[in-house]
Amino acid sequence: MPRITDEYVIHQRKVRPNIDASHRCAFRCPQCIRQKTISQDQIRRSFDLSEENFQKIFDYYTEGITFCGQISDPIYHPNFLNLLKICNGQRKRVRIATVGSGKSDAWWDEAYSYGVGENAWYFGVDGIDEKSELYRVGSNFQDVWKRMRQGRDLGQLIVWQYIIFGYNEHEIDRAIEIAKEEDFSLLLINTNRGFNPNNRLLRSNVDFQLTSPDKKHTQERVKKELWAHKSSRLLEWYRLGRRD
């Protein structure tokens, strides 16, 4: 008779863990933990995940992994392309969440050459135009949109992740139309993070221009995600994770 611990280990190998691969990020999103005074020691103690250690993690988990930084944007890991190369062709689902700004055409061409049909690129774009930069401080909307289209044209699954704020909630219907036109999946986020610019935990240099949305678009505890449009590539990506 198998032990409970054995069953637990078997189950754990089938989850997709989240990897915070480094401490690096070029942006200053006001609600991010990086912009809190309490996170600064953690950031200073952090380091870049080595390729050797990442290989061990990736080999252990059978279904894939997620790159969604809590104190980092994964694409700013200095060897992130090599991490993508490790994942390439292994028939595991890989999710990459990024702001997606600040990298060259050549960098993106190589990044998108890996994991076609296996990778899902989630771009944080909170609106249909430059208003997205009010939260993604330091990003360039036009550059990010270009990278999303570039990935789509190279066969990648592109997910448009849209946090709902007061200044973009009236544009949701138009965002859905655009997502369908561009063949992007659209994921709406009801945030559970605060809207107090005088929060004592905020760093003094935070540029807080956020406006709270209607109460129906906020959450008290855990954030809420709603798929407003699912592309055919997203549905194919889901099927990749189903093991016979």
Give the positions of each predicted feature.
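Conserved alpha-helical substructure of the radical SAM core
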Residues: M1-A120, K131-Q142, K146-R147, D153-L154, ...
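A C-terminal junction/extension of Radical SAM enzymes
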Residues: M1-Q12, G155-V159, N168-E181, S185-D244
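A glycine-centered beta->alpha junction motif in the catalytic cores
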Residues: V125-D129
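Conserved beta-strand segments of the P-loop GTPase G domain that flank and frequently precede/overlap
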Residues: G124, Q161
